[in-house]
A protein has these predicted regions:
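Acetyl-CoA-dependent GNAT
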Residues: 5-79, 84-85, 97-99, 103, ...
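Conserved G/P- and acidic residue-centered "switch" motifs that form tight phosphate/ATP-binding loops
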Residues: 60, 91-93, 108
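Conserved beta-strand-loop-alpha-helix junction that forms the acyl-donor binding cleft
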Residues: 88, 114-124, 141-145
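Alpha-helical macromolecular-interaction surfaces
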Residues: 95, 99, 122-123
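Conserved GNAT acetyl-CoA-binding A-motif
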Residues: 104-116
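Conserved acetyl-CoA-binding loop of GNAT-fold acetyltransferases
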Residues: 109, 128-137
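Terminal substrate-recognition subdomain of acyl/acetyltransferases
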Residues: 146-154
């Protein structure tokens, strides 16, 4: 699997499509996260030097994405970890997560946070725990019942 930082207009459009697929798969209205504004402004907060918007390419096909953004002086947030269905179950999600964690360390962040949901994201929660993420109190308001907040010390 290869990773590219989405930067060209074509790459940004591909990332936007993946984000839209992610939102449809999630089956939750992400308006509380200003998702429409996020899509319109890509790469936005995910742009270097403080952020990343990575897309995964597997067998010359766009497989998935992951992003990170700065949310505090030494803290970043992992966002939008997503794989298209035909690429799941092959360890690619772990590779995406490990790559974005390595990017966060390279930037100089000391901790990475994320929020996730039980149910549809149970496999992701298992992955996050395996990578060393620990549950923490909510660090922002997420109105979705059962939202889980996690942090990894980098």
């Amino acid at each position: 699997m290869n990773f590219i930082q989405a930067s060209s207009p074509e790459e940004i459009e591909s990332a936007r499509e993946l984000f839209e697929e992610y939102a449809a798969w999630l089956q939750i209205d992400l308006c509380f996260q200003s998702f429409d504004k996020e899509l319109a402004g890509l790469p936005g907060q995910y742009a270097p030097p403080d952020g990343r918007l990575l897309m995964a390419i597997e067998d010359d096909q766009l497989a998935g994405c992951v992003a990170l953004r700065k949310i505090g002086e030494d803290t970043c947030e992992m966002k939008r970890l997503f794989l298209r269905s035909q690429f799941r179950g092959k360890g690619l999600g772990r590779k995406l997560a490990e790559t974005i964690i390595a990017e966060a360390r390279q930037i100089g962040y000391e901790r990475m946070r994320l929020d996730t949901l039980p149910g549809r994201m149970d496999q992701a929660i298992k992955l996050y725990r395996a990578l060393g993420f620990q549950e923490i109190p909510a660090y922002y308001h997420n109105p979705v019942e059962g939202a889980t907040f996690m942090e990894l010390l980098l």
